[in-house]
Regions:
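Short extracytoplasmic
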Residues: 30-61
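Short, compositionally biased low-complexity segments enriched in polar/charged residues
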Residues: 60-114
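Localized chelating/binding microdomains
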Residues: 4, 27-30, 63-65, 73, ...
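Extracytoplasmic/periplasmic, Sec-exported soluble proteins
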Residues: 83, 92-95, 108-111, 121-125, ...
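Mid-length scaffold segments of soluble, non-membrane domains
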Residues: 99-147
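Hydrophobic single-pass membrane-targeting/anchoring helices
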Residues: 1-41
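Extracellularly exposed regions in secreted/surface proteins, prominently low-complexity, repeat-rich
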Residues: 146-239
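Extracytoplasmic/secreted envelope proteins and their assembly/folding machinery
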Residues: 88, 92, 130-134, 213, ...
């Protein structure tokens, strides 16, 4: 706490002699909130970052005109890794340039048991670095509209599950989203190891995969980057 306060411009003398300001300035509040968001990848339980289940809506339209909602189930969580360990070689340098701190991964299966998706949370020191990395990833993948697997997160196999044989060679579609100091990557493949279907000949399958990946990665990114309550007092019980 002392280090954090002094970094915000509160002197050691003020802290030790009870002369701390009664309220944070707006700039100090914003900095504290940014620190809290950037620390979540370290402080939150893995099961909170990667929920056991979550819902998404595939492109299917029901007879009554409504949309279908399916549940994605988490198969397992991989060990924390570096960018070099958890991402493709072609993106490691651009992620490291932004100060990649770690990659957290989990693998899910979709509601029909057809698709596997590995989600990778890449943590950066701040939102500016994450945004720059996301822009570089988008340029590298041609905007994400490609029949090829865009470079990104590597598949995370989960022993004893339907994803025990999920490897990089089985990846079909990859993309990413960015929120706050995080870039959330995902990659999807078939659960039964069938051959890749070119997107230009099966656009519906591509839409199914991206609705799954976009929905899951966006929910994880939103939770990690949600704004915390505004702090008011530096260590005091009330202002």
């Amino acid at each position: 706490m002392l280090i954090g306060l002094t970094a915000l411009g509160v002197s050691v003398y003020e802290v030790n002699n009870g002369l701390m300001p009664r309220k944070f300035t707006q700039a100090q509040q914003q900095q504290i909130m940014a620190w809290e968001v950037a620390a979540r990848w370290r402080e939150l339980p893995a099961g909170t970052i990667f929920p056991a289940t979550t819902t998404y809506s595939p492109p299917t339209v029901l007879e009554d005109g409504g949309s279908l909602t399916l549940t994605t189930r988490r198969l397992g969580i991989a060990r924390q890794a570096t960018c070099q360990q958890a991402t493709d070689p072609s993106v490691v340098s651009l992620l490291d340039r932004g100060g990649c701190e770690a990659v957290l991964r989990a693998t899910y299966v979709d509601g029909t048991g057809t698709f596997l998706v590995t989600v990778g949370v890449v943590a950066f020191p701040g939102a500016a670095q994450a945004s720059a990395a996301q822009q570089a990833l988008s340029r590298l993948s041609g905007g994400g509209q490609s029949n090829l697997v865009a470079p990104g997160v590597r598949a995370a196999a989960i022993t004893g599950t339907a994803a025990s044989g999920f490897t990089d060679t089985r990846r079909q579609v990859s993309s990413s989203v960015s929120e706050g100091p995080y870039v959330v990557l995902y990659t999807i493949g078939y659960a039964d190891n069938r051959p890749k279907v070119p997107v230009d000949t099966d656009g519906y399958t591509y839409a199914e995969m991206t609705s799954l990946g976009d929905g899951l990665s966006s929910k994880i990114a939103d939770k990690l980057s949600a704004q915390p309550p505004v702090p008011h007092c530096p260590g005091a019980s009330g202002c």
